[in-house]
């Protein structure tokens, strides 16, 4: 459906998004009508979807959506939890009417009930799970678009977009791609610049995981406060007693203070200096008496 135009060709960043979300991974079963969209089969039995055909059918579905004058006449449905958030985001971006959750039987056929609708186009997430709206659409001649896996039945489906409709990342990415292409064909956003809305906003989030993340964030915040409290504790205050008279309790020697008249400098204190000249003369060591040698020979003096 790209018509050979370069502007409509699949970009490398789009292929990387498809591969990261696992859009090319089908199921282990294959419907005979989905055989034309399968590229190969892996050794573990999982079929690989041809992403080029996925992109072509995505462009065809976007053209069908843009052809509806009133965006509210486009009805998007997802009974599975993995596609409900993506459906709501798609309806918010394109102005479509959404039915998330359980589809009430007779919405398209029973004119008596208050929830009766007459859409001009129907888009479903899973033909197997959303079989009731597909069946009712066939009764009132409403064209249908569906995200189909390798084992999805194509009965009552007019435009099948081959992709992995089981994983929440793949489903969210496909709705994001479809919304972006619709806005580009309408001229709302430019093809020259990337869309500021991230695909993460279309992904389904489990409430239990959200609760666990909030609990972990709260525990982390409490731990951080305790950690800061240990290091930012106020230092102990040391108070010094006030002393009125610093000389109180200090022993002062009773020395008479000599008074000097004003203008007279006080004399320097006397320093006791010894007179080295009055010291006795050093003894003459040469005149010192020599000790008498003791008689080592005894009484005998004649050695011969």
UniProtKB/Swiss-Prot annotation:
Database matches in InterPro entries: Ribosomal_uS2, Ribosomal_uS2_C, Ribosomal_uS2_CS, Ribosomal_uS2_euk, Ribosomal_uS2_euk/arc, Ribosomal_uS2_flav_dom_sf, Ribosomal_uS2_vert
Start and stop residues of the [DE]-W-[ST] repeats: 230-232, 245-247, 275-277, 284-286, 302-304
Keywords, sorted A to Z: Acetylation, Cell membrane, Cytoplasm, Membrane, Nucleus, Receptor, Repeat, Ribonucleoprotein, Ribosomal protein
Family matches, as PROSITE patterns: RIBOSOMAL_S2_1, RIBOSOMAL_S2_2
Site (Cleavage): 115-116, 133-134
Composition skew (Polar residues), residue ranges: 276-293
UniProt modified residues of type N-acetylserine: 2
Primary location recorded for the protein, binned into one broad class: membrane
Keyword set includes Calcium: no
GO MF terms, alphabetically ordered: laminin binding; laminin receptor activity; structural constituent of ribosome
Location in the cell: Cell membrane; Cytoplasm; Nucleus
Residue ranges of the region described as Laminin-binding: 161-180, 205-229, 242-304
Segments passing through the bilayer: none
One annotated Gene Ontology cellular component of this protein: nucleus
GO biological process: ribosomal small subunit assembly; translation
Entry comment on modification after translation: Acylated. Acylation may be a prerequisite for conversion of the monomeric 37 kDa laminin receptor precursor (37LRP) to the mature dimeric 67 kDa laminin receptor (67LR), and may provide a mechanism for membrane association. Cleaved by stromelysin-3 (ST3) at the cell surface. Cleavage by stromelysin-3 may be a mechanism to alter cell-extracellular matrix interactions.
Region (Disordered), start-end ranges: 257-304
SUPFAM superfamilies cross-referenced by the UniProt entry: Ribosomal protein S2
Family that this chain belongs to: Belongs to the universal ribosomal protein uS2 family.
Subunit structure: Monomer (37LRP) and homodimer (67LR). Component of the small ribosomal subunit. Mature ribosomes consist of a small (40S) and a large (60S) subunit. The 40S subunit contains about 33 different proteins and 1 molecule of RNA (18S). The 60S subunit contains about 49 different proteins and 3 molecules of RNA (28S, 5.8S and 5S). Interacts with rps21. Interacts with several laminins including at least lamb1. Interacts with mdk.
Other facts noted in the record for this chain: This protein appears to have acquired a second function as a laminin receptor specifically in the vertebrate lineage.
Xref: PANTHER family: 40S RIBOSOMAL PROTEIN SA (PTHR11489)
HAMAP family (UniProt xref): Ribosomal_S2_euk (MF_03015), Ribosomal_S2_laminin_receptor (MF_03016)
Function: Required for the assembly and/or stability of the 40S ribosomal subunit. Required for the processing of the 20S rRNA-precursor to mature 18S rRNA in a late step of the maturation of 40S ribosomal subunits. Also functions as a cell surface receptor for laminin. Plays a role in cell adhesion to the basement membrane and in the consequent activation of signaling transduction pathways. May play a role in cell fate determination and tissue morphogenesis.
The protein, known as: Small ribosomal subunit protein uS2
